[in-house]
Amino acid sequence: MITPFHHTPRLPFAPTPIGNPSLTLPPRPQQTMTGKSSHKAPDLPRGLNFYADYSGCGHWRMIWPELLLNCYGKANIQGGTVMIGDKNFYQGVKTVRIQRQATESQANYIKWLSQLSKELNFKIIYEIDDIIFKEDIPHYNKFRFAFEDPKIRQTSMEIMQLCDEITVTNKFMQNYYIEKTGNKNVTVVPNFIPKLWMDRYFDLAKVKDNYQRNKKRPRVVYCGSGAHFDIENRIKQKDDFYHINDVIRKTVDKFQWVFVGGFPLTLRDLIQQKKIEYHEWTNLVDYPEYINRMNPTVFYAPLEDSNFNKAKSDLKFIEGCALGIPTICQDLCTYSTAFHKFKTGDDLVSKIEYLTNDYKKYTKEVKRARDYMKSRWMEDNINFYTELYSFPYGDPKRKNLNRLNGIS
């Protein structure tokens, strides 16, 4: 156990006593005390996280890595949303990591922090897992309004240019932010899933049984944010589902289409008629169990071809792999890791048929998906984050990060 309430981490317990006079056993031979503790505090990097949110993004990119680094004793990380202006708080800190900061007051804080970092010798990392420049945010995205103010763009850019490093989720986003900001120190840190959150819900026997029970009408499930749908009809439903809505309608009796979290407005009539299932979103804690209870035969993840979507991570693919469910993903660089991809609605239907028309083939794909997760559990990849908080950009000790990012 490490306590952060000092300039450097301290072990909050006393050295082992030389002997206990209340015991009947012979005491240990006395040793000469040197004044040094027999328990040396481990040399852990101390870091600070400043979150922009406590929802999915905050957990995937900040809170879960922080939790596991602390639990494994890999680092000593404190997180929160309050920006602290007492310089003594930053004594002994190696890294300050800030998530998606964009306002004028946040920019002023980062300017002060940047000056302090030179005095106290710590680095500042800007974490971003989405595109935040208005020209590349789709008009159907319900959160676009938050980035329409030119001042937000200006301050976001200024903050990213001040930071020593930017962390992103994929190669496309890496190149995007290098080009937009001029900051060359942009590092890809993929999304990883915590075992403690999602691992326990895989059950091969259940997946096989579900396949057999729904063989005549496979359950084709989509789980995702309402930001993928043109819910305000701004651009006549030309959203992430525009290119597949027709085939969903045509195959509504062949497949049991299931939507979780949102649905295309053009399919509202089929939902009202109960021909398509719709389920409300749930909280982050219950999410794995919730989507597992949808009894999916396959998952699918459509996206419009845009810079915004190319900068997305492969979350939907690895969520499917964690549950052992084959997942069919849009054929974009976003899902370069995916096993099954589609371009058009007809492609999607063909992939569904391919995966669901043979029990042995389906079982093989289930095991293949699950095997892939061996490389994407957060606990097994925590050293990516240990390196991130411990060493500066490009340092040879960043073996995992350098290998992934092509730094020799």
Please state what every model-predicted region is.
Residues Y126-R153, L196-A205, R213-K216, S225-A227, ...:
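Acceptor-binding helix/loop patch of EC 2.4 sugar-transfer enzymes
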Residues D53-L68, K74, F192-M294:
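Conserved catalytic-core segment of nucleotide-activated headgroup transferases in glycan assembly
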Residues I2-E104:
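N-terminal pre-catalytic "stem/leader" segment of glycosyltransferase-like enzymes
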Residues S114-E119, A146-I166:
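Membrane-proximal helix-turn-helix segments that form the acceptor-binding/catalytic region
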Residues I231-D239, V285, E289-E319, C329-F339:
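Nucleotide-sugar-dependent
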Residues K206, Y359-N402:
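A charged, aromatic-enriched C-terminal amphipathic alpha-helix characteristic of glycosyltransferases
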Residues D164-I178, G182-L204, R219, C223:
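Donor nucleotide-sugar binding/catalytic pocket of nucleotide-sugar-dependent glycosyltransferases
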